[in-house]
Amino acid sequence: MKLNKIITTAGLSLGLLLPSIATATPTTFVHLFEWNWQDVAQECEQYLGPKGYAAVQVSPPNEHITGSQWWTRYQPVSYELQSRGGNRAQFIDMVNRCSAAGVDIYVDTLINHMAAGSGTGTAGNSFGNKSFPIYSPQDFHESCTINNSDYGNDRYRVQNCELVGLADLDTASNYVQNTIAAYINDLQAIGVKGFRFDASKHVAASDIQSLMAKVNGSPVVFQEVIDQGGEAVGASEYLSTGLVTEFKYSTELGNTFRNGSLAWLSNFGEGWGFMPSSSAVVFVDNHDNQRGHGGAGNVITFEDGRLYDLANVFMLAYPYGYPKVMSSYDFHGDTDAGGPNVPVHNNGNLECFASNWKCEHRWSYIAGGVDFRNNTADNWAVTNWWDNTNNQISFGRGSSGHMAINKEDSTLTATVQTDMASGQYCNVLKGELSADAKSCSGEVITVNSDGTINLNIGAWDAMAIHKNAKLNTSSASSTESDWQRTVIFINAQTQSGQDMFIRGGIDHAYANANLGRNCQTSNFECAMPIRHNNLKNVTTSPWKANDNYLDWYGIENGQSSEAEGSATDWTTNVWPAGWGAEKTVNTDGFGVTPLNIWGEHYWMLDVDMDCSKAVNGWFELKAFIKNGQGWETAIAQDNAPYTSTNHMAQCGKINKFEFNNSGVVIRSF
């Protein structure tokens, strides 16, 4: 074996092999599951690079069987770069653009098997009866089935029989090894920096060692070895050939966050019998176990909302392993379903967070957790651990950072010791430090002169601060807030069970070209800070909790998953006697309001808004009717201050619109 091919997470956490345009050493990679190459490239440029992600794991790029299911990508037909993700030219373009953004590409690589059955692949190649463009029947093991009982006691069958009927390559064969190595070397020549070896447990570790001897350079390699204990093939066998997926991490973290006590986690990692940190790739969930297979257990997924946030915050804050963030799509209970038919970057619209792509890597608690890990990599130890013996914990990373999680229904109030310098810090889970370090877009945490923090963390919430998120309080911020009451009315005929939400702010392209705001990197730059005035409607009030911005991205962290943006309330100017007892906004949160002088079916957003974020007093918005018409179409409003396909409203005014109509009435209070 070639020792120079061993890459460890210790090296990764020190920044080896990982270029970055971010301000700190990248320490975390993300799996953009089933994203096409154009979307990956755009995400590298607009978000992953600026946010400090180290790399992207992409779906297998080689030719595969046809079909819409996600697992068709895991049935190879050839090693031609023609897949559902795109063609060779598009793949090369993605690698180059991501590299320029400081983000490496890791390829999911299928070394154990080829496709089952017969047919035609995505590049037009035919296959069948173990005959493929690059392999013949003699390149495969004899057909036999892996039984469930084999995993505990029959190494031979696990590594020589067929995984779910897939043609099992003879990976001890020199020809097979040379063919796979040629594919890997081709990808490296393009610029790929790492490889996930799928189903590595089904390939003898000695075969992988021989394969790696034929691979050029020193790519990052991490091997999928599902080992929950009691296996005929153990994960420890693969430590000499690269990094290894630590599935016990995902299972035990899920068990603890769901049913246990976070206080147990003070020695999480090797102290729990896991492999050495320097060898482990860790994750809260992955594309297999979030669907209930592939090492599944009591796994936490995006469907768990805030619990998922908190589990990822812990993973990213705790110094163990090389973490992988999962970026999923909503499969609506169909575990075979492929990705959404709409691209992530859809003609200027980001199809994230709702019922299509979930984009967990953009959730502020997860992106903030990555920022925390990047900026605490120089202190690879836990300091000042504190817990309440149950589900409130806090710990530090020396003088580099400190964090706390409250997974209880009551507020966490405690004074904890840190090793950090005194001052005010931005809670990077909830906001971002301004470029001049004079303000934070979210919560500010104070470290006292003695290094303590007086924690006051709400139920099911968290905080994380680091040395590079410290506010410069020597002078006041140059931009003063200008909070003014602002009301939006949008008329739309709706039915029972339908509700209207509004998204808005400043158009990203306009802000970048004319205002110098990079809103692709930071949505806060184009969002309008708001405070809801009407919290009396029992239906919409829960949707307004933790809705602090009128923005383009919908659900904010801590906001109800039922929300589709900023919730509005149904209003009218009169209440006929035939409707029963009169309902009013003042008493009930919906119904009659003196602000509505037009008629029924006017949905109202009543907020205080920071007008200092508007463009000469103007901002944009668009409505969405849940369980109804969906989004409005393009708007062409007369006398708009600049060209836009959205409604244009004035901050500090009453603005009246019609759904899917370009007209507007604006009046003062």
Swiss-Prot record:
Top-rank taxon: Bacteria
Cofactor note: Binds 1 Ca(2+) ion per subunit. Binds 1 Cl(-) ion per subunit.
Known outcome of mutating residue 324 to Q: Abolishes chloride binding and reduces catalytic rate
Residue positions binding chloride: 196, 286, 324
Cited Gene3D superfamilies: Glycosidases, Golgi alpha-mannosidase II
Marked site: Transition state stabilizer: 288
Positions of disulphide bridges: 44-98, 144-161, 352-359, 426-440
Record's subunit section: Monomer.
Entry's family note: Belongs to the glycosyl hydrolase 13 family.
Name of the protein this chain belongs to: Alpha-amylase
Gene field: amy
